[in-house]
Amino acid sequence: MTPKTPKTPKPPQTPRPMLTVGSPPCTPCSPFVLNATSFCFRKGPARSVVYQPNGHPKQVVIDGEIWPPIFKPKNVRTAKSMQFGETDVVIATYPKCGTTWLQHITSQLIKGHDYKAGKGNELCVQSPMIERMGAAFADNIKGPRVLKTHFHHYNIPKYPDTKYIYCVRNPKDCLTSYFHHNRNFKIYNWANGTWDVFLDLFASGQLAFGDYFEHLLSWLPCLKDDNVLFLKYEDMFQDLENAVYKIGQFLGGEAAHRVENPEILREIVDNSTIDAMKKDQKRWFPESQLHKVEFIRKGGSRDWKNYFTREQSDRIDSIFAAKFAGTPAEHWWKYEMAWEEKPLSIENLSMEEEEEEQSQKLFALPPLPPQRRFSRTSLLSAGYGSVWSLSSQNANMSASSSVNKDLSTFAE
């Protein structure tokens, strides 16, 4: 009888890292634990890991990336390799950076009066998030399609004839809106979640769809691409008509013809204001998914001042400065992120106009003809909105310093 081969003893697990006061919160899928134990990959390539540490939103890890808990590996993976066509428009954002707003505007521009959203035919069904629903679902949608994604740029399928619209928003208002989003959506099981915990998770990139800062960094090199339109969320609120006109000109075809018609342009702008979008909010998501029916929560900017402490504000400022020094985004939100709100004055208006002129050089598109412009009535920003990849922590994806060096040419 052949003697049994003795079992090889299991190697001792790497001890949980010791974190000091002020360190990012350590979840089972934080980079600290991931690097030490490979927790997120123990279930094998076909399995996802759902987890919810005490006090945190419920989330899932798929291939080392953090997603909402209802996401499936097959859908995320097929979305990364799906095919886009020349009539497709892809709305790409970090969560709470104008996603629903842009879907609504773009659908009107492309489909005209054929676009209707309502209960049973919500916008999230007509214009699905590709990583949530998967390629097979999106393939069954009749073109022209308006598709939504929160993918980092390195995850998204890239086709030269497809139009991509990427909208950015200052991180403090994004964080504030995302906090309410996580409390409102039932899937996160976080209706009573706390602000301090959420801010820690946002600052350390441990939320569904990942790190805000890395997300923006991944898309910045596309700032000059012919088939990518960059929009600033705050600029859209300050001059919505001009934003709609730019989107129409970028899309071309029927969309361009619609914005060149003053009556149609006016109609689309009126349909896309905060007050208009707050009406009949069942158009956006099935109400059964929400604790509160109001998906469009609040307009205006600097709502973050109602939540942040000065220390928390300085913390986000420091992260932003470290990530974006030397890039075109370095001064994008100088006033929106400032702790002290700049008083309204002729001097400040002049300074803002100078910065807007510099911004126009980067966000280059034909400006709206003067006869169609509305008067500026506010300096405030507002918006709507609804990945950090744990695997992106390797040197090829998360080396912000090298990315910043590559991007510095765009600022010249």
UniProtKB/Swiss-Prot annotation:
GO BP, one annotated term: response to osmotic stress
Q: What cellular component GO annotations does this protein have?
A: cytoplasm; cytosol; membrane
Where is composition skewed (Polar residues) in this entry? Answer: 403-412
Annotated Gene Ontology MF terms? Answer: aryl sulfotransferase activity
Q: Which UniProt keywords apply?
A: Cytoplasm, Membrane, Transferase
Q: Which residues form the active site?
A: H150
The biased composition feature labelled Pro residues covers 1-15
Q: Pfam family example for this protein?
A: Sulfotransfer_1
Region (Disordered) residue ranges read 1-20, 393-412
EC number, UniProt record: 2.8.2.1
Q: Which residues bind 3'-phosphoadenylyl sulfate?
A: 96-101, 169, 177, 233, 272-277, 297-299
Q: Which reaction does it catalyse?
A: a phenol + 3'-phosphoadenylyl sulfate = an aryl sulfate + adenosine 3',5'-bisphosphate + H(+); bisphenol A + 3'-phosphoadenylyl sulfate = bisphenyl A sulfate + adenosine 3',5'-bisphosphate + H(+); 2-naphthol + 3'-phosphoadenylyl sulfate = 2-naphthyl sulfate + adenosine 3',5'-bisphosphate + H(+); 4-isopropylphenol + 3'-phosphoadenylyl sulfate = 4-isopropylphenyl sulfate + adenosine 3',5'-bisphosphate + H(+)
Q: How does acidity or alkalinity (pH) affect activity?
A: Optimum pH is 6.4-6.8 with 4-hydroxyphenylacetamide as substrate.
Membrane topology per the entry is:
Peripheral membrane protein
Task: Indicate where this protein resides in the cell.
Answer: Cytoplasm, Cytosol; Membrane
Q: What is this protein called?
A: Sulfotransferase ssu-1
Organism (species): Caenorhabditis elegans
